[in-house]
């Protein structure tokens, strides 16, 4: 089973619907032919809001960027953070291709024509094999069917269409109250291999019916990515196409969030809940993974130090081997902590290992503790 245990948060309720949980969002996914026959697994999807959205995105910091990353970044810059729709495909990353940007923009044009908006008001993400020429013909042949099939219940089709080596779809949504209005944040993600985001192959689409300005949306997304997707690692390889974008259409009717404050914190927590759960789903479904490993650091001098230490541990191949073999070899944890670029006092380091079976304290103040 690849399901994760979702932690409950006061004031937030998990609901069905993924990217369609928020009011006014439709989605669809279908097979257009990018993936070879005879699989006919969905390989193209579309998410649309009934109205124009505030939008923000964070993208790979790999110097080799996929064409869709460049196009989405340019589109967000041109519009000042606005988007009406998001088109995505799997199987082909459209990366390291001479005509990659031209084709990615063409897909935005095709989508925009159906929605009656400008091409720069469309976001795009692509995932799959790097260096293969992207065939536009299958997409052009199916764009009408894709658009006409948009549905307020189409979230599952969309989530399946972005899968590559994933074995399960990944989506989550929450409902909460904000300034007297019922609001939603929902999302979908994909990724099993080439997972070591630094933004944040992984693609993520987040939708919300909250009214949030583009500036505050980007601020919230950047803050939450730092403690979710950027703390994720499966194989240590940073993708060329990592994309996480959020669209906010304001149809919940709350006063627009334009500055930090209580309303911003309520929204940001909802965003955190959705993104943290998707992060765990991505790790759980990592290629070859048999266990989900989490590292919690307490007592660090600041958040950055805690993140550096935790990521050093979860990225350690020897630590992963120990956990695979259910071997409480805590020395490998201290080894990984030791080579992390963080300041700490070894004489104040404690280590505990926990699982569903229980918890054992294996190291206190930098020294081992007898355990069995």
Which stretches of residues belong to each language-model region?
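A structural signal for small-residue-enriched, beta-sheet-centric alpha/beta enzyme cores
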Residues: 2-372
């Amino acid at each position: 089973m690849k399901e994760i245990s979702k932690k409950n948060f006061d004031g937030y309720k998990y609901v069905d619907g993924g990217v369609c949980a928020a009011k006014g969002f439709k989605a669809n996914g279908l097979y257009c032919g990018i993936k070879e026959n005879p699989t006919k697994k969905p390989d193209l999807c579309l998410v649309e809001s009934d109205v124009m959205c505030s939008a923000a995105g964070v993208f790979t910091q790999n110097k080799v960027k996929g064409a869709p990353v460049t196009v989405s970044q340019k589109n967000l810059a041109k519009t000042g953070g606005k988007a009406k729709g998001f088109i995505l495909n799997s199987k082909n990353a459209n990366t390291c291709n001479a005509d990659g940007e031209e084709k990615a923009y063409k897909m935005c044009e095709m989508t925009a024509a159906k929605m009656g908006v400008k091409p720069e008001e469309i976001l795009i993400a692509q995932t799959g094999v790097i260096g293969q020429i992207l065939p536009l013909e299958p997409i052009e042949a199916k764009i009408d069917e894709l658009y006409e099939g948009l549905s307020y219940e189409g979230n599952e089709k969309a989530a399946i269409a972005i899968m590559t080596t994933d074995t399960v779809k990944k989506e989550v949504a929450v409902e909460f109250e904000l300034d007297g209005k019922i609001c939603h944040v929902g999302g979908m993600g994909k990724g099993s291999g080439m997972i070591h985001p630094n933004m944040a192959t992984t693609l993520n689409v987040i939708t919300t019916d909250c009214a949030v300005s583009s500036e505050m949306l980007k601020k919230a997304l950047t803050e939450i990515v730092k403690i979710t997707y950027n703390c994720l690692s499966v194989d240590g390889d940073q993708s060329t196409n990592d994309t996480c974008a959020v669209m906010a259409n304001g149809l919940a009717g709350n006063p627009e969030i334009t500055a930090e404050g209580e309303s911003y914190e309520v929204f940001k927590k909802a965003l955190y809940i959705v993104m943290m759960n998707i992060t765990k789903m991505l790790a759980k479904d990592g290629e070859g993974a048999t266990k989900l490993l989490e590292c919690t650091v307490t007592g660090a001098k600041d958040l950055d130090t805690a993140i550096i230490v935790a990521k050093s541990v979860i990225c350690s191949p020897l630590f992963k081997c120990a956990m695979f073999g259910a071997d409480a070899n805590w020395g490998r944890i201290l080894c990984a902590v030791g080579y992390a670029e963080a300041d700490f006092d070894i004489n104040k380091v404690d280590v505990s290992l926990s699982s569903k079976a229980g918890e054992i304290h294996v190291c206190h103040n930098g020294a081992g503790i007898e355990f069995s």
